């Protein structure tokens, strides 16, 4: 399998489906450059630069026409990894399974702010027709699945939750030793400084040190950090690491294994693959209860999800309050258990197989 063609989560999803015992036939869709540029220009002129034209009526119809209908007729079921609305335009007679980590109703004014009303109408429509066309909807969190039912009217018995697994090779998921004292190594992993809460993470580390807990922050994912933090005594900036590059992937694994706890005080999060990765090593996670994080970080089991308005002092209090040996051991074991039961791609594949068998019996 080509990780460049099936990068990140899509690659892991395809791999998990195959491991679950199914043959996967990739049916690509792609608009021509001319059509893409024409529709993009029209939407940018009409609704403003950067408008999300990918869900426009015109564009999604072009994408749907590019699907190989003969290939669709040859398979037993169709699985959409995002863009499920395309199913509506294809008149597919086979069972349709759609995967996503959110809905437009959730993302509007959460991730996507200031969307033009007409564009919002088109995106919402695209979500709705996809959900209506599918045999079953699969979401990466309870938060997202509830919206499919509440906001789009999908029957709850055809709506499922399968958390995303860790995007690491299972052979590398060897548990660390839980914290037993000494300098606390805290991992932060995220590419968006503001949304992922990097500044709050740094402030938490500063408070920990002021309160007598010697702590050091390992920053991963950020290509650059503000100049004021570049020579910070409590920070090591590892930088952005591309997991498709073997050397950088190994660096990522080595960095995770240095950590005792994972801290990401995010302000918006649909799912939480980084929490699955932390749990794979038995590393407790500390985050905010927002979006889909509650499906990945269970209070008192593999970490703590604080209220969305929690500040750095709150995080420092929670970390300090859970640093005793017994609590760290409990969180360590809970993380490993949750990873084994739900937060890995083999478990995801087994869950998908149960869904397919249930929906096609």
Model-assigned labels for residue ranges:
Residues 116-137:
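Membrane-proximal helix-turn-helix segments that form the acceptor-binding/catalytic region
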Residues 143, 165:
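Carbohydrate-associated surface elements
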Residues 175-196, 202-207, 217-220:
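Conserved donor-binding/catalytic core segment of Leloir-type glycosyltransferases
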Residues 224-255, 261:
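Nucleotide-activated donor-binding/catalytic signature segment of Leloir-type glycosyltransferases, i.e.
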Residues 263, 275, 284-287, 297:
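Short hydrophobic beta-strand element within catalytic cores of glycosyltransferases
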Residues 267:
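Aromatic "clamp/platform" in nucleotide-sugar-dependent glycosyltransferases that forms part
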Residues 327-342:
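A short, well-ordered alpha-helix in the C-terminal region of glycosyltransferases
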């Amino acid at each position: 399998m080509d990780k460049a063609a099936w990068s990140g989560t899509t690659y892991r999803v395809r791999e998990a489906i195959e491991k679950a015992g199914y043959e996967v036939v990739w049916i690509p869709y792609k608009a021509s450059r001319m059509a893409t540029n024409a529709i993009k220009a029209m939407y940018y002129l009409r609704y403003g630069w950067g408008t999300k034209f990918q869900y426009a009526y015109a564009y999604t119809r072009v994408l749907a026409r590019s699907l190989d209908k003969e290939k669709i007729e040859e398979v037993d079921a169709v699985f959409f990894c995002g863009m499920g609305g395309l199913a509506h335009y294809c008149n597919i007679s086979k069972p349709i399974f759609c995967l996503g980590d959110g809905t437009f109703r959730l993302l509007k004014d959460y991730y996507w702010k200031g969307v033009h009303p007409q564009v919002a109408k088109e995106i919402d429509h695209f979500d709705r027709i996809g959900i209506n066309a599918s045999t079953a909807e699969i979401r990466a969190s309870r938060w997202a699945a509830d919206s499919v039912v509440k906001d789009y009217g999908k029957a709850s018995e055809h709506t499922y939750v399968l958390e995303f697994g860790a995007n690491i090779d299972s052979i590398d998921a060897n548990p660390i030793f839980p914290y037993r004292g000494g300098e606390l190594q805290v991992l932060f992993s995220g590419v968006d400084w503001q949304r992922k809460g990097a500044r709050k993470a740094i402030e938490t580390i500063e408070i920990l040190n002021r309160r007598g807990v010697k702590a050091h922050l390992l920053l991963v994912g950020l290509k650059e950090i503000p100049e004021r933090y570049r020579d910070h005594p409590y920070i090591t900036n590892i930088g952005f690491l591309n997991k498709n590059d073997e050397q950088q992937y190994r660096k990522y694994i080595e960095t995770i294994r240095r950590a005792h706890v994972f801290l990401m005080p995010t302000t918006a999060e649909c799912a939480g693959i980084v929490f699955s990765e932390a749990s794979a090593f038995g590393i407790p996670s500390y985050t905010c209860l927002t979006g889909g994080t509650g499906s990945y970080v269970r209070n008192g089991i593999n970490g703590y999800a604080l209220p969305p308005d929690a500040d750095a002092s709150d995080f420092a209090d929670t970390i300090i309050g859970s640093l005793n040996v017994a609590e760290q051991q409990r969180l360590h074991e809970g993380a490993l258990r949750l990873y084994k039961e739900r937060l890995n791609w083999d478990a995801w594949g087994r869950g998908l197989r149960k869904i397919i068998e249930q929906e096609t019996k």
